[in-house]
């Protein structure tokens, strides 16, 4: 009976020793750090790897050092030019000081989320709609700087902030669509006017050449007649000016004189 009692007590003691040792051994991954509290007072961060703590007297709080992605929910706000918009964003951040992340704020993830929401509303409220639509990179940098400064006391580093979606009222979307259509029509008219101007310029240059060289017009007329006559299905009726007839006669006389000269040489 005594042996059984001693065995039971020994087993209980060994069990407590094993539990004690198991709770004293801590293994921290490469991307983690353990913030150690001894009797309620922080003594520093440990890791990565294997280390021991004193159970009951010491406590380890594990902090992830990897970059985390935080979705900022949709925020309803009004731009500087009084346009109501719905905007959401995404924040990339990581813990650079695990001790501050544990001791300076109760929940650093929730705190970063709240700061991001209020900052997003504030920055959008100070921007015009055109900036929100066309200068998003500038606003992203501004958001990143402000949120990073606000979370720095918590040991947080904000690496990037990106505005994801911008929702406009239906009426504003229709108005912008009409404006875009009007802008496309304006550019089309400008392009057409420029083409007409260039065509008019070419015609003016051609008119100047013809006025300086009347024979050029007659040669051009002959070329046109030759091109049209190439199609045998066409019936051509020409009303030639006297100048053109004179040109034909001069060409005929020149050809006849040339033939006579050849015959005389023979």
From Swiss-Prot:
Keyword line: Coiled coil, Membrane, Transmembrane, Transmembrane helix
Membrane topology, as annotated: Single-pass membrane protein
Gene Ontology CC: plasma membrane
Parts of the chain that traverse the membrane: 7-27
Coiled coil: 125-152, 178-213
SMART domains cross-referenced by the UniProt entry: PHB (SM00244)
A Pfam family this chain is assigned to: Band_7
Location within or outside the cell: Membrane
PANTHER family: AT06885P-RELATED, BAND 7 PROTEIN-RELATED
Entry similarity comment: Belongs to the band 7/mec-2 family.
Subunit structure: Homotrimer. Interacts with PH1510 and is cleaved by PH1510.
Protein name per its UniProtKB record: Stomatin homolog PH1511
